[in-house]
Amino acid sequence: GFEAVVEEVAYTWFNRICAIRFMEVNDYLPNRVRVLSSEKEGKMEPDLVTQAPDVDLDLTAQEKEEIINWKMSGTSEDTDKMFGKLFLKQCHQLHDILPGLFEADSDYMELLFGISYTNKDDVIYMLVNPETGIPEADFNVSTLDEEGNPTGQVEIIGWLYQYYNTELKDDTFAKLKKNVKITKERIPAATQLFTPDWIVRYMVENSVGRIWIEHLRAVDPTTDEKTTAERFGWKYYLPEAEQEEEVNIKL
């Protein structure tokens, strides 16, 4: 239906925009040219727009001519047309590298695609603007926290996914409280939530990690549980609590 198509198109392009933002900040794009922003501080025009048509995106002669004409026009409308064309060409190039995320689209997917970097109400502006957007450091895998751990790689993508689905998730739970039947399309938004890094570490360290320490203690009974966990750098590992003999027998 109509709503399903709208959601599919919006979610698909939101995913790709976030992925490209992550890739450009970390210099992962094949042509090393920023698509949504500029390496030059304070410059709002994306480097891809500035350097076009002299960019490695397999542009045809006709496409290069279109881009030159749009540039010469200089209007916001033509500038956004050029930006949209270049963005799509970048996605086509990334299809060869990440086909799961940048799939070969149906015609309607690109037909319904609209993007602008000049419109302050557009997702691009809100994403990259230094005053209102998400700090670039949050996307950078080289960003470290106070303890020297990377903070940009996993967390930012996860939280963007989480908050994209927040409205639908809340609405779904509200319907459940009213005993309204939920369609299958709503299930992912309500159940597939982002799990922060520390929770993943806690779960792994106290499951697989505990089994590994038990193995080490079986090999060498003098192995100290707490010391071993500290040696591995396991911050969330909880040593087994001392139990009374009667409890141990039942366990």
What spans do the regions from the language model cover?
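Preference for the N-terminal adenyl/adenosyl cofactor-binding alpha/beta module
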Residues: 1-251
